[in-house]
Amino acid sequence: MKIGIIGAMEQEVAILKDKIEGLSTITKAGCTFYTGTLNGADVVLLQSGIGKVAAAVGTTLLIAEHNVDVVLNTGSAGGFDSSLNLGDVVISTEVRHHDADVTAFGYEMGQMAQQPAAFIADEKLITTAEQALTEMSDKHAVRGLICTGDVFVCTPERQEFIRTHFPSVIAVEMEASAIAQTCHQFNTPFVVVRAISDVADKESPMSFDEFLPLAAQSSSEMVLNMVTLLK
């Protein structure tokens, strides 16, 4: 099995990249691909860039040119579930766009035309993520809906919009729905596993930039455990 791993930013892939053996680097269309073996598994690690378009371009190349069998999306996310704290983990059961609106044509809020309303994560990969979490006894995890938009959600108004239209949302970020839609169109199994960098309606002693390295550590540990289970 060849495992594709996607992170948007350098900080989100650096820990994994440093652990790849036989590392080879390929750059194309603004995306950087790191190939080799990770914990004995054949992997392609993609640093896609931030946002949905960058993520879709990178995921397309990852699947079409690097022929990965599954896709794991790692990195940070903003928590919407009140039980979450900084460093906790979210696992996708489904992923939706929160910034798509073609409801004028009868679609659900967040549903892109001619696409399903939600992109469903692979059940086996969800189970693998949950098994991987057992090696991280200090981390709490929530599984559920992750919503994506080309928006850094930082205002009460945007938070309220998302809660109103997607009441079961557990976390938000800026790439997962594009990755999920691309995987859907290629019929490639995926799961999103991210660490919480901040939580809506909770005061944080750290800024996003300050916490990002800690979120990267948590999400990378989760991915490493998953890769070991999947190989």
Swiss-Prot record:
Q: Biological process GO terms, please?
A: L-methionine salvage from methylthioadenosine; L-methionine salvage from S-adenosylmethionine; nucleoside catabolic process
Protein name as annotated = 5'-methylthioadenosine/S-adenosylhomocysteine nucleosidase
Annotated membrane-spanning segments are: none
Q: Which keywords does the record carry?
A: Amino-acid biosynthesis, Hydrolase, Methionine biosynthesis
Which lineage ranks, top first, belong to the organism behind this chain?
Bacteria, Pseudomonadati, Pseudomonadota, Gammaproteobacteria, Vibrionales
Q: Its catalytic activity?
A: S-adenosyl-L-homocysteine + H2O = S-(5-deoxy-D-ribos-5-yl)-L-homocysteine + adenine; S-methyl-5'-thioadenosine + H2O = 5-(methylsulfanyl)-D-ribose + adenine; 5'-deoxyadenosine + H2O = 5-deoxy-D-ribose + adenine
The record, for InterPro entries, names: MTA_SAH_Nsdase (IPR010049), Nucleoside_phosphorylase_d (IPR000845), Nucleoside_phosphorylase_sf (IPR035994)
Q: In which pathway does it act?
A: Amino-acid biosynthesis; L-methionine biosynthesis via salvage pathway; S-methyl-5-thio-alpha-D-ribose 1-phosphate from S-methyl-5'-thioadenosine (hydrolase route): step 1/2
Gene Ontology CC entries for this record: cytosol
Where do the annotations place substrate binding? G78, V153, M174, E175
Function comment:
Catalyzes the irreversible cleavage of the glycosidic bond in both 5'-methylthioadenosine (MTA) and S-adenosylhomocysteine (SAH/AdoHcy) to adenine and the corresponding thioribose, 5'-methylthioribose and S-ribosylhomocysteine, respectively. Also cleaves 5'-deoxyadenosine, a toxic by-product of radical S-adenosylmethionine (SAM) enzymes, into 5-deoxyribose and adenine.
Q: According to the UniProt record, what class of enzyme is this? A: hydrolase
- In this protein, the active site sits at E12, D198
The record's similarity note reads: Belongs to the PNP/UDP phosphorylase family. MtnN subfamily.
